[in-house]
């Protein structure tokens, strides 16, 4: 999906939550968030890399990291958003929308078009509400090494 120019529907942080750009000091909280994320799980190194070289946005409640979005790759003109995850007990409050909105705003301010792909309909619904539109189908194949 891509976010056409001028189509972002911004989503503020829900009441009681803080949405902000993450720093290296947030690594522990991000590791805790993604530890039990199933197929969304990420190693500490996979979280440290975007903190250092790209961008990560998070939502927190009383200092606890409860949702996040990051860029998996960036070029001069594009930013591939991924790692969008909300802890199960905090779902349904608009947190994924809020962190995706924030990271998209930052990418746009840098002259980069936000892009992403999704694997479940709930995620697709969130992205469409923000203004993203389908531009094709992404296929991913994993091969086992012997």
Describe each model-derived feature in a short phrase.
Residues 82-88, 92-109, 124-129:
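Conserved acetyl-CoA-binding loop-helix of GNAT-fold acetyltransferases
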Residues 107-119:
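Conserved GNAT acetyl-CoA-binding A-motif
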Residues 97, 120-137, 144:
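Conserved active-site alpha-helix within GNAT-family acetyltransferase domains
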Residues 25, 76, 121-122:
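Short alpha-helical
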Residues 1-15, 139-143:
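Acyl-donor-binding surface of acyltransferase catalytic domains
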Residues 42-85:
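A conserved beta-strand-loop-helix scaffold within acyl/acetyltransferase catalytic domains
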Residues 18-30:
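A short beta-loop-alpha structural element at the N-terminal edge
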Residues 22, 32-42:
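Helix-loop element at the rim of GNAT/NAT acetyltransferase active sites that forms part
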């Amino acid at each position: 999906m891509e976010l056409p120019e001028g189509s972002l529907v911004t989503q503020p942080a829900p009441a009681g939550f803080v949405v902000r750009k993450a720093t290296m000091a947030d690594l522990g909280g991000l590791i805790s968030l993604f530890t039990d994320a199933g197929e969304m799980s990420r190693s500490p190194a996979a979280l440290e890399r975007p903190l250092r070289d790209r961008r990560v946005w998070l939502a927190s409640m009383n200092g606890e990291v409860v949702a996040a979005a990051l860029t998996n790759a960036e070029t001069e003109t594009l930013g591939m958003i991924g790692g969008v995850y909300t802890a199960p007990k905090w779902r349904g409050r608009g947190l994924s929308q809020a962190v995706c909105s924030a990271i998209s705003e930052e990418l746009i301010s840098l002259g980069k078009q936000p892009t992403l792909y999704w694997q479940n309909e709930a995620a697709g619904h969130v992205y469409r509400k923000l203004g993203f539109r389908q531009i094709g189908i992404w296929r991913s194949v994993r091969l086992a090494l012997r």
